[in-house]
Protein backbone atom coordinates (compact mmCIF):
# COMPACT_ATOMS: atom_id res chain seq x y z
CA UNK A 1 0.00 0.00 0.00
CA UNK A 2 2.84 2.38 0.87
CA UNK A 3 4.48 1.74 -2.53
CA UNK A 4 1.19 2.50 -4.28
CA UNK A 5 0.82 5.81 -2.42
CA UNK A 6 4.41 6.75 -3.25
CA UNK A 7 3.83 5.93 -6.92
CA UNK A 8 0.59 7.94 -7.04
CA UNK A 9 2.23 10.91 -5.33
CA UNK A 10 5.16 10.77 -7.78
CA UNK A 11 2.82 10.68 -10.76
CA UNK A 12 0.87 13.65 -9.37
CA UNK A 13 4.05 15.70 -8.89
CA UNK A 14 5.36 14.85 -12.35
CA UNK A 15 2.07 15.68 -14.05
CA UNK A 16 1.10 18.76 -12.02
CA UNK A 17 3.03 21.16 -14.26
CA UNK A 18 1.06 20.14 -17.32
CA UNK A 19 -2.22 20.46 -15.41
CA UNK A 20 -1.58 24.14 -14.79
CA UNK A 21 -0.20 25.17 -18.19
CA UNK A 22 -0.12 23.80 -21.68
CA UNK A 23 2.46 25.89 -23.50
CA UNK A 24 2.16 26.22 -27.28
CA UNK A 25 5.17 27.61 -29.17
CA UNK A 26 4.10 30.66 -31.18
CA UNK A 27 7.39 32.45 -31.93
CA UNK A 28 11.11 31.76 -31.97
CA UNK A 29 14.25 33.63 -33.05
CA UNK A 30 17.96 33.68 -32.19
CA UNK A 31 17.32 35.20 -28.74
CA UNK A 32 14.09 33.71 -27.43
CA UNK A 33 11.19 31.31 -27.82
CA UNK A 34 7.72 32.49 -26.84
CA UNK A 35 4.88 30.22 -25.78
CA UNK A 36 1.21 30.90 -25.13
CA UNK A 37 -1.01 28.97 -22.72
CA UNK A 38 -4.12 28.61 -24.88
CA UNK A 39 -6.16 27.52 -21.85
CA UNK A 40 -5.72 30.94 -20.24
CA UNK A 41 -7.13 32.99 -23.12
CA UNK A 42 -10.16 34.73 -21.63
CA UNK A 43 -12.32 37.73 -22.48
CA UNK A 44 -13.89 40.05 -19.92
CA UNK A 45 -15.50 43.46 -20.44
CA UNK A 46 -13.89 44.05 -23.84
CA UNK A 47 -10.38 42.98 -22.84
CA UNK A 48 -8.59 39.70 -23.35
CA UNK A 49 -6.22 38.07 -20.85
CA UNK A 50 -3.54 35.42 -21.30
CA UNK A 51 -0.26 33.98 -19.99
CA UNK A 52 2.93 33.90 -22.09
CA UNK A 53 6.16 32.08 -21.32
CA UNK A 54 9.46 33.40 -22.71
CA UNK A 55 12.52 31.14 -22.83
CA UNK A 56 15.80 33.00 -23.38
CA UNK A 57 18.69 31.44 -25.30
CA UNK A 58 21.15 33.23 -22.95
CA UNK A 59 20.62 34.38 -19.38
CA UNK A 60 19.30 37.91 -18.92
CA UNK A 61 20.79 40.66 -16.70
CA UNK A 62 19.35 39.13 -13.52
CA UNK A 63 20.44 35.57 -14.44
CA UNK A 64 16.93 34.70 -15.65
CA UNK A 65 16.52 32.07 -18.35
CA UNK A 66 12.74 32.29 -18.62
CA UNK A 67 9.79 34.36 -17.58
CA UNK A 68 6.02 34.21 -17.47
CA UNK A 69 3.87 37.27 -18.08
CA UNK A 70 0.15 37.76 -17.52
CA UNK A 71 -1.18 40.21 -20.08
CA UNK A 72 -4.33 42.23 -20.70
CA UNK A 73 -5.04 43.19 -24.30
CA UNK A 74 -7.39 45.42 -26.24
CA UNK A 75 -7.86 43.89 -29.69
CA UNK A 76 -9.75 46.88 -31.10
CA UNK A 77 -6.94 49.42 -30.69
CA UNK A 78 -3.91 47.11 -30.36
CA UNK A 79 -2.73 47.92 -26.86
CA UNK A 80 -1.59 45.79 -23.93
CA UNK A 81 -0.93 45.97 -20.20
CA UNK A 82 1.56 43.81 -18.37
CA UNK A 83 -0.27 42.66 -15.23
CA UNK A 84 2.29 40.27 -13.71
CA UNK A 85 5.84 39.25 -14.61
CA UNK A 86 7.62 36.30 -13.02
CA UNK A 87 11.29 35.55 -13.73
CA UNK A 88 12.91 32.12 -13.42
CA UNK A 89 16.49 30.88 -13.23
CA UNK A 90 15.74 27.82 -15.41
CA UNK A 91 14.03 27.31 -18.79
CA UNK A 92 10.27 26.76 -19.08
CA UNK A 93 9.37 28.62 -15.88
CA UNK A 94 11.35 26.57 -13.38
CA UNK A 95 12.92 27.88 -10.14
CA UNK A 96 11.26 31.25 -9.54
CA UNK A 97 13.52 34.27 -9.00
CA UNK A 98 11.15 37.23 -8.72
CA UNK A 99 7.53 38.32 -9.21
CA UNK A 100 6.51 41.83 -10.17
CA UNK A 101 2.98 43.17 -10.28
CA UNK A 102 2.64 46.86 -11.16
CA UNK A 103 0.25 48.81 -8.93
CA UNK A 104 -1.27 50.72 -11.85
CA UNK A 105 -0.06 49.25 -15.15
CA UNK A 106 -0.02 51.51 -18.20
CA UNK A 107 -1.42 50.69 -21.60
CA UNK A 108 1.25 50.22 -24.28
CA UNK A 109 0.29 50.50 -27.94
CA UNK A 110 1.74 47.68 -30.03
CA UNK A 111 2.95 48.34 -33.59
CA UNK A 112 1.85 45.59 -35.99
CA UNK A 113 5.45 44.74 -36.95
CA UNK A 114 6.58 44.23 -33.32
CA UNK A 115 6.69 41.07 -31.21
CA UNK A 116 4.12 42.68 -28.86
CA UNK A 117 1.85 43.35 -31.82
CA UNK A 118 2.27 39.77 -33.05
CA UNK A 119 1.46 38.34 -29.61
CA UNK A 120 -1.63 40.51 -29.24
CA UNK A 121 -2.84 39.76 -32.78
CA UNK A 122 -2.27 36.02 -32.30
CA UNK A 123 -4.07 36.02 -28.94
CA UNK A 124 -7.02 37.98 -30.36
CA UNK A 125 -7.36 35.58 -33.30
CA UNK A 126 -7.10 32.49 -31.10
CA UNK A 127 -9.58 33.72 -28.50
CA UNK A 128 -12.63 32.73 -30.52
CA UNK A 129 -11.06 29.94 -32.55
CA UNK A 130 -12.25 26.40 -32.02
CA UNK A 131 -9.89 23.78 -30.60
CA UNK A 132 -9.41 22.33 -34.10
CA UNK A 133 -8.59 25.76 -35.54
CA UNK A 134 -6.08 26.35 -32.75
CA UNK A 135 -4.37 23.02 -33.48
CA UNK A 136 -4.11 23.85 -37.19
CA UNK A 137 -2.37 27.16 -36.50
CA UNK A 138 0.42 25.48 -34.56
Where does each model-flagged region fall?
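N-terminal secretory-pathway/extracellular module detecting exported/lumenal segments
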Residues: 18-69, 74-138
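Sec-dependent N-terminal signal peptides
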Residues: 4-15
Amino acid sequence: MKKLLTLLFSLFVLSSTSVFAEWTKIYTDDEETIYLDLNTLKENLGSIYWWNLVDLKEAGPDAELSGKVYMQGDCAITRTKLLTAISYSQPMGEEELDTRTPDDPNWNFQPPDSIGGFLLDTSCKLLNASAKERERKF
